[in-house]
Amino acid sequence: MRYGYWLPVFGGWLRNVEDEGMEASWNYVSKLARRSEQLGYDLTLIAELNLNDIKGVEAPSLDAWSTAAALAAVTTTLELMVAVRPTFHQPALLAKQAANIDHIGGNGRLSLNVVSSWWADEARKYGVEFEQHDDRYARTREWLEIVERLWQEDHFSYSGKYYHVDDAVLQPKPTTRPRPTIYAGGESEAAKELISRWCDAYVMHGDEPSRVREKIRDMSERRERLGLPPMKFGVAAYAIVRDTETEAKRELERVTNVQQFAAGYENYQQW
C-alpha cells in the first residue's frame, strides 16, 4: 500500500472554509512536496483546473503542468500524478511535454490522472468546447491511443474523429517503460469501459468498504476479460484527527456542510 496527498493548488480543498492556512503558491507547494518526501509520502496528485472551483473563481489556482515540471526538478522520490483533461490538451503535444518532465524527474516519477472534464463554465471562459458526456469519453479514447503510441513508436500517423497526427516523431521517449502509469476514475459505463482498456489504475472517491470492494471486483473482472495485466486501485479520503470521536464527528459535519454563501458553491455540482 502507498500513500499520497492532493497538492493544495487551490489553497486547500474545503469549499466552506475560507482560509485553511495553505497558500496557492509555488513557494508553499514546493516546500510541502520536499517535506512530504522526508515524511515518507509516495505521491502527490496535482489537480488541473484553470479556475479555482474550491475557493471561488477569483481566487488563485496553480497550473498543473508547469507546477509538475518545477516539482520534478526539486524532488527526488515523490511520484507526480498530474491531472490532464484531453479537451484542454492536444495529445501529441501533451505526450511530448510529459516525456520531457519524466526525464527531468527521473526514476519514472511522472504519472497521468486522465479526467474527461466536468466544468462547463471553465471550458467556455477559456474558449474550449464542452462536449456531452459520452462524446468526451470518445475523445479521451482517441487521445489516450495517440499518447500511448507516441510514447512507444516513431513516424506515427493517426486519423480519427477528433484528432489527426501525420508521421509524428517523439524523442526522447519517457524513461518509464513501457509508459508512465495512467490513472483515471469514473462511475459511468463509458468511463469504466475506457479505463479498463486504456488505463493502468482505477481511482475512486471514498465510500463504504463494501461499495469499494464491489467496484474493485467489477473493474478487475473487466480487466481480466480483456486479457490485460491486473488493474491497480486507489481511494481518496480525508483524515480527521481529534481527541474524541464526538469532536471528530463535529468537525466532519462542519467541513461537509457546504453553504450557499461559500465562494466555491456555484461550481459545486456543475457537471
Model-derived segments and spans:
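Active-site mouth loops of central-metabolism enzymes
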Residues: W13-N27, A83-A92, E129, T176-E187, ...
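Acidic (Asp/Glu)-rich catalytic clusters
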Residues: E37-Q38, A68-T77, A98, D102-L110, ...
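Conserved, mostly hydrophobic/aromatic
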Residues: Y3, S36, G40, L71, ...
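Short, acidic/polar
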Residues: E23-S36, L94-Q97, A184-L194
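N-terminal beta1-alpha1-beta2 module of alpha/beta enzyme domains
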Residues: M1-V74, S159, K173-P180
